[in-house]
C-alpha cells in the first residue's frame, strides 16, 4: 500500500508490475498530481496493480495508509490469510538507505571531477516534502560524509522550512496545490525520525 503525490506511485507500480506473489495498491490525491502523473498511473499495466484517487490531499491519502498499518490486530489477521503489507513511500524507513547512498555517490563524483577535495564540505539544497531526502543527507553526515549545510527548500506549503526557522510545527494552515506536488505536504513522515 502506498500513497503518492505522483512519481512514487508510477515507479512502484512499474517495479511490481506482474511480479509473482505481490500486489500493489497506490492512492493519490484527486486533483493533487499532474495530468502526466495521473495518466502514467491510471494506464499502468499489470494484473497485480491498482490505483485509486482519494478525496483530499496527499496528507489525507498518506494518513489513511498509515492507519491501515497501525490497525491493532490487522497485521495478524492479514498474516493468517498469507498477506504481508509494506509501503513504497516515505513511511517505509527502508527507502532512506538508498537515499543515503546517493549522497556518498554525488560526493565521490565531485571529488573525481576535481570539483572538491577529499574532506572538503559540500552544501546541499534539497526540495523537501516528506523530509526523507534531506534526512538521508543528515544520516550521510552522521556516517562521516563531509556535508556542510543542508538547506530545506519548499514551496508555498512551507511547514518544514517554518519549523526549522521557528521550532514550531504548525500543520493547521492553508494547503496549496502547486506545480511541485511532491512538496504539497503538511504532515511530513520523516521529521519524527530526526526528532526521536
Regions found by a protein language model. Give the residues of each.
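PLP-dependent amino-acid enzyme catalytic core
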Residues: 1-196
Amino acid at each position: 500500500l502506498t500513497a503518492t503525490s505522483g512519481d512514487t506511485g508510477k515507479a512502484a507500480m512499474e517495479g511490481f508490475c506482474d511480479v509473482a506473489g505481490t500486489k500493489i495498491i497506490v492512492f493519490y490525491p484527486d486533483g493533487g498530481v499532474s495530468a502526466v502523473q495521473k495518466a502514467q498511473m491510471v494506464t499502468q499495466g499489470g494484473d497485480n496493480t491498482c490505483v485509486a484517487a482519494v478525496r483530499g490531499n496527499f496528507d489525507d491519502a498518506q494518513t489513511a495508509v498509515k492507519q491501515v498499518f497501525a490497525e491493532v490486530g490487522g497485521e495478524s489477521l492479514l498474516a493468517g490469510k498469507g498477506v504481508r503489507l509494506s509501503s513504497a513511500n516515505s513511511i517505509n524507513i527502508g527507502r532512506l538507505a538508498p537515499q543515503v547512498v546517493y549522497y556518498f555517490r554525488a560526493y565521490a563524483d565531485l571529488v573525481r571531477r576535481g570539483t572538491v577535495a577529499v574532506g572538503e564540505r559540500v552544501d546541499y539544497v534539497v526540495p523537501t516534502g516528506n523530509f526523507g531526502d534531506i534526512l538521508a543527507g543528515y544520516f550521510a553526515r552522521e556516517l562521516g560524509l563531509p556535508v556542510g549545510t543542508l538547506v530545506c527548500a519548499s514551496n508555498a506549503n512551507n511547514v518544514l522550512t517554518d519549523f526549522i526557522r521557528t521550532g514550531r510545527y504548525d500543520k493547521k494552515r492553508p494547503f496549496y496545490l502547486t506545480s511541485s506536488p511532491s512538496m504539497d505536504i503538511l504532515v511530513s513522515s520523516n521529521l519524527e525520525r530526526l526528532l526521536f
